[in-house]
Amino acid sequence: MIGIDIVSIARVEKCVKRFEMKFLERFLSPSEIVLCKDKTSSIAGFFALKEACSKALQVGIGKELSFLDIRISKSPKNAPLITLSKEKMDYFNIQSLSASISHDAGFAIAVVMVSSSNL
């Protein structure tokens, strides 16, 4: 399955200014916050990536999957890497996850591809 999401960078910037760390901690782990380096476009990209992952799994963010179950890191070449907690990898019987993020014209867009025998 494939999931896609697009986020307004300006909207994320308003939320960061208004709610500061409380906003970030709602959907990013401490290591993901460090990866974003206070860069609003990166924060928006990570948000879009987590939403795209939930859509690819056909559950959305909620009871079956939380933002913090989805983990983002970077490859040595700075490409996004995505995984889920062990519990969720098993729950969804995920074999592999692939991700891409792009930024342009004030938006961040993300695509996630999930290989699973359940979907």
Swiss-Prot record:
Signal in keyword set: no
Gene3D superfamilies: 4'-phosphopantetheinyl transferase domain
Keywords of this entry: Cytoplasm, Fatty acid biosynthesis, Fatty acid metabolism, Lipid biosynthesis, Lipid metabolism, Magnesium, Metal-binding, Transferase
GO process annotations (BP): fatty acid biosynthetic process
Amino-acid positions noted as binding Mg(2+) in the UniProt annotation, renumbered to this chain: D5, E51
Reaction catalysed by this enzyme: apo-[ACP] + CoA = holo-[ACP] + adenosine 3',5'-bisphosphate + H(+)
Pfam families per the UniProt record, alphabetical: ACPS (PF01648)
Molecular function, one GO term: holo-[acyl-carrier-protein] synthase activity
Listed EC numbers: 2.7.8.7
Subcellular location: Cytoplasm
Organism domain of life: Bacteria
Entry cofactors: Mg(2+)
GO cellular component, one term: cytoplasm
Function according to Swiss-Prot or TrEMBL: Transfers the 4'-phosphopantetheine moiety from coenzyme A to a Ser of acyl-carrier-protein.
Family membership noted in the UniProt record: Belongs to the P-Pant transferase superfamily. AcpS family.
NCBIfam families: acpS, pantethn_trn
Name listed for the protein in its UniProt record: Holo-[acyl-carrier-protein] synthase
Source organism (scientific name): Helicobacter pylori (strain G27)
Gene encoding the protein: acpS
